[in-house]
Protein backbone atom coordinates (compact mmCIF):
# COMPACT_ATOMS: atom_id res chain seq x y z
CA UNK A 1 0.00 0.00 0.00
CA UNK A 2 1.03 3.56 -0.64
CA UNK A 3 -0.07 6.54 1.41
CA UNK A 4 -1.16 9.75 -0.28
CA UNK A 5 -2.03 13.17 1.12
CA UNK A 6 -5.78 13.57 0.62
CA UNK A 7 -6.58 16.77 2.54
CA UNK A 8 -5.39 19.20 5.14
CA UNK A 9 -6.73 18.20 8.55
CA UNK A 10 -7.71 21.80 9.32
CA UNK A 11 -9.83 21.87 6.15
CA UNK A 12 -12.17 19.18 7.53
CA UNK A 13 -14.04 20.21 10.67
CA UNK A 14 -16.10 17.46 12.36
CA UNK A 15 -19.15 16.58 10.27
CA UNK A 16 -17.67 17.68 6.95
CA UNK A 17 -16.46 16.06 3.74
CA UNK A 18 -14.58 17.00 0.59
CA UNK A 19 -14.33 15.49 -2.86
CA UNK A 20 -10.75 14.69 -3.86
CA UNK A 21 -9.01 12.85 -6.68
CA UNK A 22 -6.12 10.86 -5.25
CA UNK A 23 -3.90 8.76 -7.52
CA UNK A 24 -6.63 8.87 -10.16
CA UNK A 25 -9.40 7.72 -7.80
CA UNK A 26 -12.44 9.84 -6.98
CA UNK A 27 -12.77 9.87 -3.19
CA UNK A 28 -14.81 11.47 -0.46
CA UNK A 29 -12.54 12.40 2.43
CA UNK A 30 -14.63 12.99 5.54
CA UNK A 31 -14.34 13.78 9.20
CA UNK A 32 -16.98 12.10 11.32
CA UNK A 33 -18.72 13.89 14.17
CA UNK A 34 -16.34 12.16 16.62
CA UNK A 35 -13.33 13.71 14.85
CA UNK A 36 -12.09 10.58 13.05
CA UNK A 37 -11.02 10.82 9.41
CA UNK A 38 -12.25 8.48 6.67
CA UNK A 39 -12.07 8.05 2.90
CA UNK A 40 -14.59 6.26 0.69
CA UNK A 41 -15.17 5.92 -3.04
CA UNK A 42 -17.14 8.86 -4.43
CA UNK A 43 -19.78 6.61 -5.97
CA UNK A 44 -23.07 5.48 -4.44
CA UNK A 45 -23.67 1.78 -5.04
CA UNK A 46 -27.39 2.37 -5.56
CA UNK A 47 -27.41 4.43 -8.76
CA UNK A 48 -23.68 4.97 -9.43
CA UNK A 49 -24.07 8.68 -8.71
CA UNK A 50 -21.42 10.72 -6.83
CA UNK A 51 -21.60 11.03 -3.05
CA UNK A 52 -20.10 14.50 -3.29
CA UNK A 53 -22.40 16.89 -1.44
CA UNK A 54 -23.73 14.16 0.85
CA UNK A 55 -24.25 14.94 4.54
CA UNK A 56 -21.97 13.45 7.16
CA UNK A 57 -24.19 12.21 9.97
CA UNK A 58 -22.39 10.74 12.97
CA UNK A 59 -19.94 8.29 11.37
CA UNK A 60 -21.92 7.83 8.15
CA UNK A 61 -22.45 9.64 4.87
CA UNK A 62 -25.86 10.09 3.25
CA UNK A 63 -26.10 10.08 -0.55
CA UNK A 64 -27.42 13.46 -1.73
CA UNK A 65 -29.44 11.87 -4.54
CA UNK A 66 -31.60 9.13 -3.01
CA UNK A 67 -30.68 9.07 0.69
CA UNK A 68 -28.71 5.81 0.88
CA UNK A 69 -26.50 5.82 3.98
CA UNK A 70 -23.04 4.26 4.31
CA UNK A 71 -20.66 3.69 7.23
CA UNK A 72 -17.59 5.86 6.68
CA UNK A 73 -15.18 3.40 8.30
CA UNK A 74 -16.25 0.18 6.57
CA UNK A 75 -18.31 1.33 3.58
CA UNK A 76 -21.15 -0.93 4.79
CA UNK A 77 -24.73 -0.02 3.83
CA UNK A 78 -26.66 1.46 6.75
CA UNK A 79 -29.83 2.52 4.96
CA UNK A 80 -31.75 1.97 1.72
CA UNK A 81 -32.17 2.21 -1.16
CA UNK A 82 -28.60 0.87 -1.59
CA UNK A 83 -28.04 -2.86 -1.04
CA UNK A 84 -24.28 -3.04 -1.58
CA UNK A 85 -21.51 -1.29 0.30
CA UNK A 86 -18.93 1.10 -1.09
CA UNK A 87 -15.14 0.93 -0.98
CA UNK A 88 -13.59 2.39 2.18
CA UNK A 89 -9.88 3.19 2.41
CA UNK A 90 -7.67 3.29 5.52
CA UNK A 91 -6.75 6.81 6.62
CA UNK A 92 -4.71 8.56 9.28
CA UNK A 93 -3.97 12.11 10.34
CA UNK A 94 -0.27 12.93 10.56
CA UNK A 95 1.49 16.27 10.79
CA UNK A 96 -1.67 18.20 9.95
CA UNK A 97 -2.64 16.24 6.85
CA UNK A 98 -5.06 13.41 6.19
CA UNK A 99 -3.39 10.49 4.46
CA UNK A 100 -5.20 7.71 2.63
CA UNK A 101 -3.69 4.32 1.80
CA UNK A 102 -4.31 2.95 -1.67
CA UNK A 103 -3.20 -0.29 -3.27
Q: What residues fall within each predicted segment?
A:
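Short glycine/proline-centered loop/turn elements that form peptide/ligand docking sites
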Residues: 80
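Short cysteine clusters
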Residues: 44, 63-66
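N-terminal pre-ligand scaffold of iron-sulfur
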Residues: 1-58, 71-72, 76, 85-103
Amino acid sequence: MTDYVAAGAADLPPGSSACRTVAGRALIVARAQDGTYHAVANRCSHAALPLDGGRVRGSSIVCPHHGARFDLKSGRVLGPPAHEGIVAYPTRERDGVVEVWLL
